[in-house]
């Protein structure tokens, strides 16, 4: 049985797409090993059938301290890959993959990289020069070296299995008496900005349109929840608050509009099920990739991008009301999203099989 090694870590945005790819490769009778870091150890599910290994490497803060840590991590990765003798190594970007990718190059194992964002990150840009194939999620991905374009294939993003099980078409009902459901989330602990901005936006909206029927589901840190509860209770609207939502699929299927950051995994999941969103990109994201992701979708009429530096509760309230008042806009946006949908887990698996 041939072995494939997947390397992803740092955040769930890298980790979960790699797991979805691994599940598809296991179905195709490959032995799949998964190298991750300590931050993603909490996501490991041995029931998925993947064989996990942890080699930790964080983003460098001090280059003098980083080099010895990188050398140690590369040594561990070489030792592991030599023992496995894989047919290919697939990296998903970010600093946690660096050691394993260097090890694969040293051992002359074919490497493939997958870029989830619309802007090729620093790590993927470097390893693109050594990769047999570069899989991208967007045909207009920026920051691609010219010399690798003939090795680049659009496979689309990769979506978790439980999200792929949802109905692909989000149906819109032109019913003014219907409760409009908004789902708000912003990272593993909820974005502080969202806890302050969005309740004030809903308050401004309800003051101008008191007859609106809303249901708000919002991710928020525990410290922020009392204040948010008071605002929503005083507005007499239905709401649900949580620090973290385990079952995103269940939330998506009961939602009309999402307000979120613009990470690659979020965008791919919403694209797959045709669920429109207002994106507020995280300004501190590496290479400003969240802005590039959201702006590309906005340009293709697949969502709305509102920059954090420019947004206000009044502007957000106006945008929400515009969308509630015009269900046709949401319907068209949903259709545009579905046109972008790809079965990334299958297309990337095909690419790997062609390579080995």
Swiss-Prot record:
UDP-N-acetyl-alpha-D-glucosamine binds at residues 11-13, 117, 160, 188, 290. It is a peripheral membrane protein. It comes from the Bacteria. It catalyses: di-trans,octa-cis-undecaprenyl diphospho-N-acetyl-alpha-D-muramoyl-L-alanyl-D-glutamyl-meso-2,6-diaminopimeloyl-D-alanyl-D-alanine + UDP-N-acetyl-alpha-D-glucosamine = di-trans,octa-cis-undecaprenyl diphospho-[N-acetyl-alpha-D-glucosaminyl-(1->4)]-N-acetyl-alpha-D-muramoyl-L-alanyl-D-glutamyl-meso-2,6-diaminopimeloyl-D-alanyl-D-alanine + UDP + H(+). One of its GO terms (cellular component) is plasma membrane. It is an enzyme of class 2 (transferase). Pfam families: Glyco_tran_28_C, Glyco_transf_28. It is found in: Cell inner membrane. Its EC number is 2.4.1.227. Pathway: Cell wall biogenesis; peptidoglycan biosynthesis. GO terms for biological process: carbohydrate metabolic process; cell division; cell wall organization; lipid glycosylation; peptidoglycan biosynthetic process; regulation of cell shape. SUPFAM superfamilies: UDP-Glycosyltransferase/glycogen phosphorylase. Keywords: Cell cycle, Cell division, Cell inner membrane, Cell membrane, Cell shape, Cell wall biogenesis/degradation, Glycosyltransferase, Membrane, Peptidoglycan synthesis, Transferase. GO terms for molecular function: UDP-N-acetyl-D-glucosamine:N-acetylmuramoyl-L-alanyl-D-glutamyl-meso-2,6-diaminopimelyl-D-alanyl-D-alanine-diphosphoundecaprenol 4-beta-N-acetylglucosaminlytransferase activity; undecaprenyldiphospho-muramoylpentapeptide beta-N-acetylglucosaminyltransferase activity. NCBIfam families: murG (TIGR01133). Belongs to the glycosyltransferase 28 family. MurG subfamily. HAMAP family: MurG. Cell wall formation. Catalyzes the transfer of a GlcNAc subunit on undecaprenyl-pyrophosphoryl-MurNAc-pentapeptide (lipid intermediate I) to form undecaprenyl-pyrophosphoryl-MurNAc-(pentapeptide)GlcNAc (lipid intermediate II). This is UDP-N-acetylglucosamine--N-acetylmuramyl-(pentapeptide) pyrophosphoryl-undecaprenol N-acetylglucosamine transferase. The gene is murG.
């Amino acid at each position: 049985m041939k072995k494939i090694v997947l390397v992803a870590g740092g955040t769930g945005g890298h980790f979960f797409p790699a797991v979805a790819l691994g599940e598809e490769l296991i179905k195709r009778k490959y032995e799949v090993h998964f190298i991750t870091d300590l931050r993603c150890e909490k996501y490991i599910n041995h029931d998925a059938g993947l064989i996990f290994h942890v080699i930790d490497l964080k983003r460098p803060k001090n280059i003098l301290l980083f080099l010895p840590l990188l050398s140690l991590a590369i040594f561990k990765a070489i030792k592991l890959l030599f023992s496995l003798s894989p047919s290919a190594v697939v990296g998903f970007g970010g600093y946690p993959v660096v050691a394993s990718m260097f090890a694969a190059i040293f051992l002359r194992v074919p490497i493939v990289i997958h870029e989830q964002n619309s802007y090729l990150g620093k790590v993927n840009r470097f390893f693109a020069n050594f990769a047999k194939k570069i899989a991208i999620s967007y045909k207009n991905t920026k920051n691609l070296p010219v010399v690798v374009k003939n090795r680049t294939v659009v496979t689309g993003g990769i979506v978790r299995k439980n999200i792929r099980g949802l109905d692909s078409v989000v149906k819109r009902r032109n019913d003014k008496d219907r409760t409009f459901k908004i789902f708000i989330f912003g990272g593993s602990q909820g974005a502080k900005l969202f806890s302050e901005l969005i309740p004030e936006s809903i308050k401004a909206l309800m003051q101008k349109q008191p007859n609106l029927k809303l249901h708000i589901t919002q991710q928020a840190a525990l410290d922020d929840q009392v204040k948010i509860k008071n605002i929503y209770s005083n507005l007499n609207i239905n709401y649900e608050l949580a620090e973290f939502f385990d079952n995103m699929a269940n939330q998506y299927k009961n939602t009309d509009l999402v307000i979120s950051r613009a990470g690659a995994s979020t965008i791919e999941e919403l694209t797959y099920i045709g669920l429109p969103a207002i994106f507020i990109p995280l300004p501190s994201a590496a290479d400003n990739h969240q802005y590039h992701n959201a702006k590309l979708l906005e340009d293709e009429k697949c969502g709305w991008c509102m920059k954090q530096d420019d947004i206000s509760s009044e502007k957000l309230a106006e945008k929400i009301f515009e969308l509630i008042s015009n269900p046709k806009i949401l319907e068209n946006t949903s259709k545009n999203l579905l046109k972008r949908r790809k079965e990334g887990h299958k297309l990337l698996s095909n690419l790997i099989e062609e390579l080995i």
